Curated annotation (Swiss-Prot):
Its EC number is 1.6.5.-, 1.7.1.17. Keywords: Flavoprotein, FMN, NAD, Oxidoreductase. Binds 1 FMN per subunit. It comes from Trichormus variabilis (strain ATCC 29413 / PCC 7937) (Anabaena variabilis). This is FMN-dependent NADH:quinone oxidoreductase 2.
Amino acid sequence: MANILHIDSSPRGDRSISRKLSYEFLTSWKDTHPGDTVTYRDLGHNPVPHVDEPWIAAAFSSPDSHTPELKAAIELSDTLIDEFLAADRFVFGVPMYNLNIPSTFKAYIDQIVRVGRTFSVDANGYKGLVDSSKKVLIITSRGGSYPPGTPYAAYDYQEPYLRAILGFMGLTDVTFIHAESLNMGEDAREKSLADAKDAIAQAVANW
């Protein structure tokens, strides 16, 4: 049995493609893995705050020296990190906004990427502290298309960033399913959604 952390980051509700597809995956997954548990966090509708000066002061100082104010500043981060580390697998629904991820998801990442908790640093450099055997599935929605080897590939700051920051914490087994070309005409949209649903079915069988 596994504990899956499912995160949606779109501010949209029923109109969100990334929500629908991540839900479709988890529903099918639960049918074939009924013993697994799912922890759900909705960043689109319940965003976490951006880091601020008290947060930074707390994150880069010894807990033994924390005042009540600093303890309060880092409390949510500790909760989010504990939740993140307790997961065995991760499913993220992430739309592309302006070539990158939503600010809600970036704020969450900033809360959980913390020295001494999810990464360490010494004279030899950085080391991820999250178990590298844990798998990540990221389902994205995109208005355009950014195929490798084309001029548009350079515009994709979504997948490269997520691979980099997850790898920084130690998570390197990352699978992407892109529902793209959603604003490039009805035919392209329908084909991309069908391809994404096929990829979801394959992920349910093989992930």
